[in-house]
Amino acid sequence: RRNSKELKMDYSFLIYIGMVCALCFSAVGSGFGAVKASLASVGGWQKCYINGKQDPFIMVGFAGAPLTQTIYGFLLSNFISAKLATPTLSYGIMSLCIGILAGAVIGISALFQGKVAASSADALAETGKGTAKYFIVIGIIETVALFTLVFSLLILNN
């Protein structure tokens, strides 16, 4: 007969995988979103130069908008790490699921935010108008990532 202490397993590896997924999926989405927005910003500046128009520097903001989701993934990863204090199976599975799913949602939000930022850069280059409205729409997509982060933190704290 084995001692009950011998049967106790350490499930911290599940928590670590959840931490990595939260950060990596968020960062991948941010990277793809930033590339999409950056390419459109560069194309927008090119249109301005060709047409002899002023090049709006604010398009740098469009290009960088998806990068904030990497920060959210990092924050989520840090909050998941709190479960390392008690690496039970239930905390391991919860951390893994939250890391994968919330990380993916945050990353997808960044990807689509990059697409909207790309359209915004193109529209601003064409018209020179609507900057505030473009940032409002970009911010709406940002809200999905923020809600995901906050709701994930609430679940982790239960």
Predicted feature locations:
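Short, Lys/Arg-enriched N-terminal segments with co-localized hydrophobic residues
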Residues: 1-8
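Hydrophobic, small-residue-rich transmembrane alpha-helices and their short perimembrane loops
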Residues: 8-158
